[in-house]
Regions:
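A positional/architectural concept
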Residues: 14-61
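Structural preference for beta-strand elements that scaffold enzyme active sites
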Residues: 35-37, 56-58, 77-81, 108-110, ...
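Active-site-adjacent beta->alpha loops and helix N-cap segments on the catalytic face
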Residues: 42-49, 87-99, 140-147
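Short beta-strand/loop segments at the ligand-binding rim of alpha/beta enzyme cores
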Residues: 52-59, 98-111
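Glycine/Thr-rich beta-alpha phosphate-binding loop at enzyme active sites
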Residues: 56-99
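Catalytic cores of alpha/beta
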Residues: 59-61, 67-72, 117-130
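Glycine-rich phosphate-binding active-site loops on the catalytic face of alpha/beta enzymes
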Residues: 126-147
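C-terminal helical cap(s) of enzyme catalytic domains, especially alpha/beta-barrels
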Residues: 140-167
Length: 173
């Protein structure tokens, strides 16, 4: 079973990530009985069918897809994946932050695709709390990468108060 990092721990991943192969349509994709992350196109085409299954729901966004399509339904999802098709494509950082801050999504946001240790700390800052690393990377070393920085200066999705405000609050207490 594959493993992921979730909430600063390494766990077994029981979610299957479904993709549309060339020639597949959202309507033709076979849905498994076990928990699955479906592409946004499948969710949009088969929303009622997926809701009726009563199984845990998960959807993933490719980097060129925006989270606004999920705004009304975000509370239905146990997991929303954000895909990083390559290291240099940072649009999914924005998608994660929008999910947390604009759409108030409180479930798991999982980084998928070309996910490397160097990115994890910054992904967390944007609200991502689970990471499916690229297959050739060491998950134990990557977990250590989340602990590189002990303090953050700026406000972000994972820490709404900047450092100077946290210091003032500590001194006042």
């Amino acid at each position: 079973m594959p493993r992921i990092i979730k909430n600063d721990s390494i766990i077994d991943d029981n979610w299957q990530v479904l993709t549309l192969a060339e020639g597949d349509t959202p309507e033709s994709l076979r849905l498994p009985a076990e928990p699955a992350l479906v592409p946004l196109a499948v969710w949009l085409a088969r929303r009622d069918e997926l809701i009726a299954t009563q199984a845990p729901l998960g959807v993933w966004l490719d980097s060129h897809e925006g989270p606004e399509a999920l705004a009304a339904d975000s509370a239905r999802f146990a997991v929303i994946g954000v895909n990083f098709p390559k290291f240099t494509d940072g649009r999914s950082y924005s998608n994660a932050r929008l999910l947390r801050e604009r759409y108030h999504y409180v479930g798991e946001i999982r980084a998928l695709g070309d996910v490397l240790q160097d990115q994890l700390f910054y992904m967390r800052r944007c609200g991502i709390d689970a990471y499916a690393l690229r297959g050739d990377k060491d998950i134990d070393k990557a977990l250590a990468g989340l602990r590189v920085f002990s303090e953050t200066y700026q406000a972000a999705a994972d820490q709404p108060q900047p450092l100077f405000r946290r210091r003032i609050a500590r001194e006042a207490a």
